[in-house]
Structures are given as structure tokens and as C-alpha cells.
Amino acid sequence: MSSLLPPAKKIWWNEPIHKSELLWITLVFVWGMVMTFMMPYWHVVGKQNLSNETYRTTPKAFQASAEAFVDQYTVRKEGPRNYPVVAPPAGGDVYMIARLWDWWPIIELKKGETYRFHLSSLDLQHGFSLQPANINIQVLPNYEHVFELTPDRSGEYSVIGNEYCGIGHHLTIGKRFVVE
């Protein structure tokens, strides 16, 4: 096979590198090194990345934990489907179940308090997206995803399912209330 435009010199790799090429190679290398070290540095220093833990579980065991959590801390029911609104104690654990077309239950948190979230799926892979904070986690069956969250603004927030889970995917929405 031959090139359409063969090089003028057949042995081009023995030619000295031009200064402008050397400058660009150096800039690219230095920038690559800066970015390589900035990623772990910013993970530690920046506040936008979640440091989460993941544990093996079963859907049955996680559902039992979540239902016990809901039974203990439910304060009211909302919506046409009577979803429980759960207000855990400050510093407590929060359990959320992802399942076909549903994030369960609705959570009510206190502003400025830290909570430990436990997420798991009972059926398929789901995406947990807390908006507008833009926190995203892939939630898988047989795994319990745990992270800490401290709400800093009061209001109503949406939990969006951002992983396609079937024909009712557009219904995979949950709520989060943050109160003073």
C-alpha cells in the first residue's frame, strides 16, 4: 500500500525536530501532567465530587431496611399514590429504593444537617440524579451505595432517574424537601 502524497524524504524520522514542534510537544506534555495531578487533587479539595462507599446486599435485605426506615420516620403521605414522606433525624441514615419507574420514599431533610444516604435498586440499573445540585450516581441491584449529604438550601428538589429503565422511564422521579 502506498500513500497518496509520500513524504519528500523517505527517512523522515531522522530529521531534527523543529523548534515550534518541540514547543507544542512540551506544552501538551506539561498540560497533560497538570491535568493528571489536578484530578486527584480536586477530588480531595473540591466539594463537587462524592466520596461514596459501596457494599454487597440483596434486594430483599435492602427492601427490609428501607421499609423499617419508612415505618419508623414517616411524618405524612403525599400525592395520588400516597407516598410516605419520611423525616429522618439529623445525622441519621436515609434509605431510598430505586425500582421500575419509581424512587421511594419522599425524603424531608433539615437544612445544614448531614445525612447518610443508602441507595439500592430492586430490579435494574437506575441513575440517581439530584437536581439542581447535579449529584449523579449509578445505582445497581445487589449493591448498596452510601454517601453523605448536607443540604445547604431549603426548598423542593427532584430526584430524576437518568438511566433508561423501560417504557415508563419518564416516570422515574422522586422528591426531596429541605426545611429550615
Label every PLM stretch briefly.
Residues 1-101:
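Extracytoplasmic entry segments of secretory-pathway proteins
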Residues 18, 43, 49, 55, ...:
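Histidine (H) residue identity feature
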Residues 28-48, 64-65, 137-180:
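Extracellular/periplasmic metallocenter environments
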Residues 92, 113, 124, 172-173:
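Residues that flank catalytic or metal-binding motifs in active/ligand-binding sites
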Residues 96, 117, 161:
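Divalent metal-coordination and catalytic microenvironments
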Residues 101, 133-135, 164:
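Residue-level signature for short turns and capping positions that connect secondary-structure elements
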Residues 102-105, 176:
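Generic preference for hydrophobic/aromatic residues in regular secondary structure cores
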Residues 106-110, 114-158:
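Membrane-embedded segments
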